[in-house]
Amino acid sequence: MTFAPTTRQKSPLRNIFDHDFLMMHELQKMITAALGEVHGIVLDVGCGHQPYRRWIKSDVTYVGIDIDSTDSTPTIVSNSMRLPFQANTFDSAICFEVLEHVSNPFVVVNEIARVLQPGGILLLSTPQSWRLHEAPYDYFRYTRFGLQHIVQESGLNVEHIIPIGGVWSHVAQTSLNAWPHHQLGRFLNPAIALTNVIFYSLNKLWHDTRDPLGHLLIAHKATEQQLLHNVHYNI
């Protein structure tokens, strides 16, 4: 990454008393399900404290990269805009809640595509709506179409873009983020829990995904056979 954040989350686990439950609970569910597709050698770009490593299968070889080791635990310290690996090195790549913090997301995704082997998988999540965080290294928010454009420009094939939450999650999470958590602390817990339960239920009953909190994208790098087919098709 191109930033040195002051605070990095060590775990995505949340309960209904957490003010960011509506975002993190949905994000965790989607990511843990998608991680079942990760195989071989996996690169975790912007790994932080490796919070998602626990859900990666034990037979997968894990490599975590981050630009800073003062508040993260990377395998390798390096900038994600110039990954220190040869092309076609990794079978899988993951990049969760990182792309909004890099000044040139096209370069980072191009680098991920470069080091993926043909047929390799990328799992990528970004927020669409979230308050300013890890300032001043907070540059972008992504719609599904912006995210799709960046990944397709790298040559990867986008297969799924899954919304995280919906309009009800958005309304509640925006409100909860503004509450005075530091001042009132645990005294807010009952109100936080009630808000989370009500709006989580509303989101399930009336699932409008036009205004989500974020997205999880799944993409693959074309295999050599697919590339040859495309060449013959275009001749």
Segments (PLM) and residue ranges:
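Conserved N-terminal segment of class I S-adenosyl-L-methionine
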Residues: 1-88, 92, 96, 106-109, ...
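Residue-level signal for short amphipathic helical patches enriched in basic/charged
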Residues: 37, 100, 142
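Residues lining the SAM
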Residues: 96-99, 125
